Amino acid sequence: MSAVQRRLPVYKKILEENKKKWMIKEFLEYKLSKYGYIDSEILKTPLGTRIVIYAERPSRIIGKKGVIVKEISNILVNKLGVENPQIDVIDVSKIEAPEMFPKVIAYRIANAMAKGVRFRRVMFVAVRQLMEAGAKGFEIVVSGKLSTERARFEKLTYGKLYKIGYDAKNRVRRAVVHVLLKPGIYGIEVRIAPASLQYSDEYKIKPPVKPETTSQQ
C-alpha cells in the first residue's frame, strides 16, 4: 500500500478496494471466459490478496506447468497493482451445490438453446434444479427473438429475491450470458439468492432462557 493510499479517509479506502475488486473480476472474466471461468472471490489477507477462481475446467485455467496462472498473476501485479496475488482454482463441479452460481445456470441454458432445445423447456429445467438445490430465491430472464420477429423477454421468478439495496448489490448473485443463434443474439440473465444467504432484515429472536431453580435441603 502506497503512502497516498494510507492517507485516504476510511470511506475512500473502501471505495478504492471495491473498485479494485470489480476491476479484478472484470479482467478475470474477460481473460478466462473461454476456459470455463464461472466466478471468483477476492479476499485481503495479511500476506497479500487471495483470489479464488471457480471454473468448469480448472486445468485449462491453470495451464501447462501453471503458465496461464503465472501470466494472470503478473498482469494483476503490474497492471492492476494487486499486492502478492495468491491464486487458487477450484472445480465448480466438486462444490456441494454448483447451481448456486448463476453463471453455471446461465451457461447451461445457453448451451441447451444452442443445441436447439426450446427456451421454455430449458428455463423450467433450470427452475427445478435451483429448487432442488435449495435456492432461497431466483430469477431467470431470457431475452431475444423468442417466438416472433420482435425481440421480447420471458421471466421466471421464485422465492425471496431483492433487486435493490445493499443485499441485492452485495449478496444476491447475478450473471449475464449471451448466445448467438440463427435468429440473432439472445441474453440470459440469472439472479440467485443462495440457500445460505441471510438478508439484512432477517433476524431470529431467541426464546427467553428460564432461570435454573435450586432447592435447598
Swiss-Prot record:
Molecular function, one GO term: rRNA binding
Sorted UniProt keywords: Ribonucleoprotein, Ribosomal protein, RNA-binding, rRNA-binding
InterPro entries in alphabetical order: KH_dom-like_a/b, KH_dom_type_2, KH_sf_prok-type, Ribosomal_S3_C_sf, Ribosomal_uS3_arc, Ribosomal_uS3_C, Ribosomal_uS3_euk/arc
CDD domains: KH-II_30S_S3_arch
Keyword flag Ribosomal protein: yes
One GO BP: translation
Regions that span the bilayer: none
One of the record's GO cellular component terms: cytosolic small ribosomal subunit
Pfam families referenced in this protein's UniProt entry, alphabetically: KH_2, Ribosomal_S3_C
Keyword Ribonucleoprotein: yes
SUPFAM superfamilies for this protein: Prokaryotic type KH domain (KH-domain type II), Ribosomal protein S3 C-terminal domain
All residue ranges annotated as the KH type-2 domain in the record: 24-93
Record-linked Gene3D superfamilies: 3.30.300.20, Ribosomal protein S3, C-terminal domain
Top-level lineage group: Archaea
Subunit comment: Part of the 30S ribosomal subunit.
Function summary: Binds the lower part of the 30S subunit head.
Family named by the database record: Belongs to the universal ribosomal protein uS3 family.
Protein name: Small ribosomal subunit protein uS3
Species this protein is from: Pyrobaculum islandicum (strain DSM 4184 / JCM 9189 / GEO3)
Chain's gene name: rps3
